[in-house]
Design a protein with these regions (language model features):
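Transmembrane alpha-helices of multi-pass small-molecule transport proteins
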Residues: 29-76, 155-159, 178-193
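Glycine-/small-residue-enriched transmembrane alpha-helix faces in small-molecule transporters
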Residues: 1-35, 140-165, 285-286
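Loop-to-transmembrane-helix transition segments
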Residues: 4-11, 56-80, 143-154, 191, ...
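Alpha-helical transmembrane segments of compact multi-pass small-molecule transporters, enriched
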Residues: 43-47, 96-110, 125-126, 182-186, ...
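Helix-helix packing/entry segments at the starts of transmembrane helices
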Residues: 93-99, 166-182, 217-249
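Hydrophobic transmembrane alpha-helices of multi-pass small-molecule transport proteins
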Residues: 48, 119-136, 156, 258-277
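C-terminal transmembrane-helix exit sites in multi-pass transporters
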Residues: 52, 56, 81-83, 100-122, ...
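C-terminal-most transmembrane helix of multi-pass membrane proteins
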Residues: 237-286
Length: 286
Protein backbone atom coordinates (compact mmCIF):
# COMPACT_ATOMS: atom_id res chain seq x y z
CA UNK A 1 0.00 0.00 0.00
CA UNK A 2 2.84 2.41 0.85
CA UNK A 3 4.24 1.98 -2.64
CA UNK A 4 0.86 2.97 -4.05
CA UNK A 5 0.67 6.03 -1.79
CA UNK A 6 4.15 7.15 -2.85
CA UNK A 7 3.33 6.69 -6.53
CA UNK A 8 0.05 8.61 -6.26
CA UNK A 9 1.68 11.42 -4.29
CA UNK A 10 4.30 11.64 -7.04
CA UNK A 11 1.54 11.67 -9.67
CA UNK A 12 -0.34 14.52 -8.01
CA UNK A 13 2.92 16.45 -7.58
CA UNK A 14 3.53 16.02 -11.32
CA UNK A 15 0.02 17.19 -12.22
CA UNK A 16 0.46 20.31 -10.09
CA UNK A 17 3.94 21.01 -11.48
CA UNK A 18 2.51 20.60 -14.99
CA UNK A 19 0.07 23.43 -14.32
CA UNK A 20 2.95 25.58 -13.03
CA UNK A 21 4.86 25.24 -16.31
CA UNK A 22 1.61 25.78 -18.20
CA UNK A 23 1.00 28.98 -16.24
CA UNK A 24 4.54 30.15 -17.09
CA UNK A 25 3.79 29.63 -20.80
CA UNK A 26 0.53 31.56 -20.50
CA UNK A 27 1.80 34.41 -18.31
CA UNK A 28 5.25 34.94 -19.87
CA UNK A 29 4.63 33.98 -23.50
CA UNK A 30 0.96 34.87 -23.98
CA UNK A 31 -0.13 31.33 -24.87
CA UNK A 32 -3.70 30.20 -24.20
CA UNK A 33 -4.70 27.30 -21.99
CA UNK A 34 -5.93 25.39 -25.04
CA UNK A 35 -2.57 25.77 -26.78
CA UNK A 36 -0.69 24.55 -23.71
CA UNK A 37 -2.97 21.53 -23.28
CA UNK A 38 -2.30 20.48 -26.90
CA UNK A 39 1.24 19.46 -25.97
CA UNK A 40 -0.07 17.29 -23.16
CA UNK A 41 -2.25 15.33 -25.56
CA UNK A 42 0.36 15.28 -28.32
CA UNK A 43 3.13 13.86 -26.13
CA UNK A 44 0.67 11.52 -24.44
CA UNK A 45 -0.52 10.08 -27.76
CA UNK A 46 3.08 9.44 -28.85
CA UNK A 47 3.95 7.79 -25.52
CA UNK A 48 0.81 5.62 -25.50
CA UNK A 49 1.29 4.53 -29.12
CA UNK A 50 4.95 3.69 -28.54
CA UNK A 51 4.08 1.61 -25.48
CA UNK A 52 1.34 -0.28 -27.34
CA UNK A 53 3.65 -1.03 -30.25
CA UNK A 54 6.35 -2.21 -27.84
CA UNK A 55 3.89 -4.48 -25.99
CA UNK A 56 2.15 -5.45 -29.26
CA UNK A 57 -1.24 -4.36 -27.96
CA UNK A 58 -4.01 -4.10 -30.55
CA UNK A 59 -5.21 -0.57 -31.31
CA UNK A 60 -8.75 -1.82 -31.99
CA UNK A 61 -11.14 -1.05 -29.10
CA UNK A 62 -13.75 -3.63 -28.13
CA UNK A 63 -16.35 -1.01 -27.22
CA UNK A 64 -15.77 2.13 -29.24
CA UNK A 65 -18.73 3.96 -27.66
CA UNK A 66 -17.42 4.17 -24.11
CA UNK A 67 -13.81 4.59 -25.22
CA UNK A 68 -14.85 7.55 -27.39
CA UNK A 69 -17.04 9.07 -24.67
CA UNK A 70 -14.15 8.78 -22.23
CA UNK A 71 -11.76 10.43 -24.68
CA UNK A 72 -14.03 13.32 -25.64
CA UNK A 73 -15.20 14.08 -22.09
CA UNK A 74 -11.65 13.97 -20.74
CA UNK A 75 -10.51 16.31 -23.50
CA UNK A 76 -13.25 18.78 -22.61
CA UNK A 77 -12.31 18.56 -18.93
CA UNK A 78 -8.62 19.26 -19.65
CA UNK A 79 -9.45 22.19 -21.96
CA UNK A 80 -11.70 23.72 -19.30
CA UNK A 81 -9.09 23.12 -16.62
CA UNK A 82 -6.26 24.83 -18.49
CA UNK A 83 -8.58 27.68 -19.42
CA UNK A 84 -9.22 27.98 -15.70
CA UNK A 85 -5.48 28.02 -15.01
CA UNK A 86 -5.10 30.76 -17.65
CA UNK A 87 -7.70 33.08 -16.17
CA UNK A 88 -7.51 32.17 -12.49
CA UNK A 89 -4.77 30.98 -10.14
CA UNK A 90 -2.93 27.66 -9.94
CA UNK A 91 -4.30 27.24 -6.41
CA UNK A 92 -7.96 27.86 -7.23
CA UNK A 93 -7.96 25.90 -10.49
CA UNK A 94 -6.58 22.75 -8.87
CA UNK A 95 -8.88 22.99 -5.84
CA UNK A 96 -11.99 23.40 -7.98
CA UNK A 97 -10.96 20.65 -10.40
CA UNK A 98 -10.67 18.26 -7.46
CA UNK A 99 -14.43 18.41 -6.91
CA UNK A 100 -14.78 15.71 -9.59
CA UNK A 101 -15.24 12.75 -7.15
CA UNK A 102 -18.35 14.47 -5.80
CA UNK A 103 -19.78 14.71 -9.32
CA UNK A 104 -18.91 11.04 -9.90
CA UNK A 105 -21.05 10.21 -6.88
CA UNK A 106 -23.95 12.17 -8.42
CA UNK A 107 -23.58 10.73 -11.92
CA UNK A 108 -22.77 7.08 -11.13
CA UNK A 109 -26.42 6.02 -10.57
CA UNK A 110 -27.34 7.21 -14.07
CA UNK A 111 -24.26 6.16 -16.06
CA UNK A 112 -22.90 3.17 -14.11
CA UNK A 113 -26.15 2.08 -12.45
CA UNK A 114 -24.40 2.23 -9.07
CA UNK A 115 -26.35 3.16 -5.97
CA UNK A 116 -25.27 6.30 -4.13
CA UNK A 117 -25.82 6.46 -0.39
CA UNK A 118 -28.16 9.22 0.74
CA UNK A 119 -25.76 10.34 3.47
CA UNK A 120 -23.27 11.32 0.77
CA UNK A 121 -25.39 14.36 0.02
CA UNK A 122 -23.92 15.84 3.20
CA UNK A 123 -20.49 15.72 1.56
CA UNK A 124 -21.96 17.23 -1.59
CA UNK A 125 -23.16 20.19 0.46
CA UNK A 126 -19.71 20.51 2.05
CA UNK A 127 -18.09 20.53 -1.38
CA UNK A 128 -20.53 23.16 -2.65
CA UNK A 129 -19.80 25.31 0.40
CA UNK A 130 -16.08 24.96 -0.34
CA UNK A 131 -16.64 25.91 -3.97
CA UNK A 132 -18.61 28.98 -2.90
CA UNK A 133 -15.81 30.15 -0.62
CA UNK A 134 -13.18 29.74 -3.35
CA UNK A 135 -15.16 31.28 -6.20
CA UNK A 136 -16.46 34.17 -4.07
CA UNK A 137 -13.59 34.85 -1.64
CA UNK A 138 -14.69 38.47 -1.22
CA UNK A 139 -18.40 37.65 -1.67
CA UNK A 140 -18.72 40.16 -4.52
CA UNK A 141 -17.60 38.86 -7.94
CA UNK A 142 -16.94 35.62 -9.81
CA UNK A 143 -13.77 34.95 -11.80
CA UNK A 144 -14.59 33.27 -15.16
CA UNK A 145 -11.45 31.15 -14.73
CA UNK A 146 -12.82 29.74 -11.48
CA UNK A 147 -16.05 28.79 -13.26
CA UNK A 148 -14.07 27.02 -16.00
CA UNK A 149 -12.09 25.10 -13.37
CA UNK A 150 -15.30 24.08 -11.60
CA UNK A 151 -16.84 22.99 -14.91
CA UNK A 152 -13.70 20.92 -15.54
CA UNK A 153 -14.48 19.05 -12.32
CA UNK A 154 -18.06 18.43 -13.48
CA UNK A 155 -17.00 17.18 -16.92
CA UNK A 156 -14.22 15.10 -15.33
CA UNK A 157 -16.96 13.42 -13.30
CA UNK A 158 -18.57 12.29 -16.56
CA UNK A 159 -15.14 11.18 -17.83
CA UNK A 160 -14.52 9.00 -14.76
CA UNK A 161 -17.94 7.36 -15.07
CA UNK A 162 -17.30 6.62 -18.74
CA UNK A 163 -13.88 5.25 -17.78
CA UNK A 164 -15.51 2.78 -15.39
CA UNK A 165 -17.67 1.47 -18.23
CA UNK A 166 -14.82 1.44 -20.76
CA UNK A 167 -12.65 -0.67 -18.43
CA UNK A 168 -15.26 -3.43 -18.58
CA UNK A 169 -14.38 -3.98 -22.24
CA UNK A 170 -10.94 -2.53 -22.99
CA UNK A 171 -7.44 -2.39 -21.54
CA UNK A 172 -5.92 0.68 -19.90
CA UNK A 173 -3.51 1.07 -22.83
CA UNK A 174 -6.30 1.27 -25.41
CA UNK A 175 -8.34 3.66 -23.27
CA UNK A 176 -5.32 5.90 -22.67
CA UNK A 177 -4.39 6.04 -26.36
CA UNK A 178 -7.93 7.00 -27.38
CA UNK A 179 -7.95 9.53 -24.58
CA UNK A 180 -4.89 11.29 -26.00
CA UNK A 181 -5.69 11.01 -29.73
CA UNK A 182 -9.05 12.83 -29.65
CA UNK A 183 -7.40 15.43 -27.44
CA UNK A 184 -4.88 16.20 -30.18
CA UNK A 185 -7.53 16.38 -32.90
CA UNK A 186 -10.03 18.44 -30.90
CA UNK A 187 -7.31 20.83 -29.76
CA UNK A 188 -6.14 21.31 -33.33
CA UNK A 189 -9.66 22.10 -34.51
CA UNK A 190 -10.25 24.61 -31.71
CA UNK A 191 -6.95 26.47 -32.02
CA UNK A 192 -6.32 26.04 -35.77
CA UNK A 193 -7.44 29.54 -36.93
CA UNK A 194 -4.70 31.47 -35.13
CA UNK A 195 -2.24 28.89 -33.81
CA UNK A 196 1.46 29.04 -34.53
CA UNK A 197 4.13 26.75 -33.09
CA UNK A 198 5.69 28.57 -30.12
CA UNK A 199 9.42 29.08 -29.96
CA UNK A 200 12.00 29.62 -27.25
CA UNK A 201 10.79 29.54 -23.68
CA UNK A 202 7.13 29.20 -24.71
CA UNK A 203 7.86 25.91 -26.45
CA UNK A 204 10.09 24.75 -23.58
CA UNK A 205 7.44 25.51 -20.95
CA UNK A 206 4.71 23.79 -23.00
CA UNK A 207 6.81 20.68 -23.59
CA UNK A 208 7.73 20.51 -19.90
CA UNK A 209 4.08 20.90 -18.92
CA UNK A 210 3.01 18.14 -21.31
CA UNK A 211 5.83 15.73 -20.46
CA UNK A 212 5.35 16.11 -16.70
CA UNK A 213 1.59 15.54 -17.06
CA UNK A 214 2.23 12.36 -19.09
CA UNK A 215 4.64 11.17 -16.38
CA UNK A 216 1.96 11.91 -13.79
CA UNK A 217 -0.59 9.87 -15.76
CA UNK A 218 1.83 6.93 -15.88
CA UNK A 219 2.51 7.15 -12.13
CA UNK A 220 -1.23 7.33 -11.45
CA UNK A 221 -1.95 4.26 -13.59
CA UNK A 222 0.77 2.20 -11.90
CA UNK A 223 -0.04 3.53 -8.44
CA UNK A 224 -3.63 2.27 -8.49
CA UNK A 225 -2.29 -1.26 -8.86
CA UNK A 226 -1.01 -1.06 -5.28
CA UNK A 227 -3.78 0.82 -3.50
CA UNK A 228 -7.55 0.57 -3.40
CA UNK A 229 -9.56 3.24 -5.15
CA UNK A 230 -11.04 4.73 -1.97
CA UNK A 231 -7.68 5.35 -0.32
CA UNK A 232 -6.28 6.49 -3.65
CA UNK A 233 -8.88 9.22 -3.99
CA UNK A 234 -7.83 10.61 -0.61
CA UNK A 235 -4.16 10.63 -1.62
CA UNK A 236 -5.18 12.45 -4.81
CA UNK A 237 -6.52 15.21 -2.60
CA UNK A 238 -2.88 16.04 -1.81
CA UNK A 239 -2.94 18.12 -5.00
CA UNK A 240 -4.81 20.76 -3.00
CA UNK A 241 -1.77 21.07 -0.72
CA UNK A 242 0.74 20.99 -3.58
CA UNK A 243 -1.24 23.61 -5.51
CA UNK A 244 -1.46 25.88 -2.49
CA UNK A 245 2.28 25.68 -1.81
CA UNK A 246 3.34 26.15 -5.45
CA UNK A 247 0.73 28.78 -6.22
CA UNK A 248 1.62 30.95 -3.25
CA UNK A 249 5.41 30.50 -3.38
CA UNK A 250 5.85 30.79 -7.17
CA UNK A 251 3.01 33.03 -8.36
CA UNK A 252 2.10 34.79 -5.10
CA UNK A 253 -1.47 33.49 -5.41
CA UNK A 254 -3.77 35.08 -2.84
CA UNK A 255 -4.48 32.62 -0.04
CA UNK A 256 -7.23 34.12 2.08
CA UNK A 257 -8.94 32.46 5.01
CA UNK A 258 -11.99 31.85 2.80
CA UNK A 259 -9.91 30.01 0.18
CA UNK A 260 -8.18 27.90 2.84
CA UNK A 261 -11.54 26.96 4.37
CA UNK A 262 -12.93 26.21 0.90
CA UNK A 263 -10.05 23.86 0.12
CA UNK A 264 -10.46 22.16 3.50
CA UNK A 265 -14.19 21.58 2.91
CA UNK A 266 -13.51 20.08 -0.53
CA UNK A 267 -10.87 17.80 1.01
CA UNK A 268 -13.31 16.66 3.69
CA UNK A 269 -15.90 15.92 1.00
CA UNK A 270 -13.31 13.81 -0.86
CA UNK A 271 -12.74 11.77 2.30
CA UNK A 272 -16.47 11.30 2.68
CA UNK A 273 -17.41 10.24 -0.83
CA UNK A 274 -14.39 7.91 -1.06
CA UNK A 275 -15.99 5.66 1.55
CA UNK A 276 -13.06 5.91 3.95
CA UNK A 277 -15.35 7.42 6.57
CA UNK A 278 -17.52 4.27 6.58
CA UNK A 279 -14.53 2.20 7.70
CA UNK A 280 -13.99 4.34 10.79
CA UNK A 281 -17.64 5.20 11.45
CA UNK A 282 -19.71 2.20 10.27
CA UNK A 283 -23.48 2.85 10.09
CA UNK A 284 -24.26 -0.01 12.51
CA UNK A 285 -21.58 0.77 15.05
CA UNK A 286 -18.47 -1.26 15.90
Amino acid sequence: MYKGILLLLSAEFCFTLSTVFGKFAMADEGMTGIEVSFFRFFLGAIAAAAYMLWKRVSFRPNNITYVALRGVSNTAAVLLFFTGVQHSTVTNANMLNLTYPVFVFLLAPFINRERSRGRYFIFLLLALAGVYLIILPDFSSVNPGDLCALLSGLVAGFAICFLREARKFDSSEVILFYLMLPGCLINLMVMAPGFSIPSGTGLAYSLCSGAIAVAGQALLTVGYRYIEAARGSIVSGSRILFAGIMGVSIFSDPLTLQIVLGGALILVSLVGVSGIARKFFPPNGM
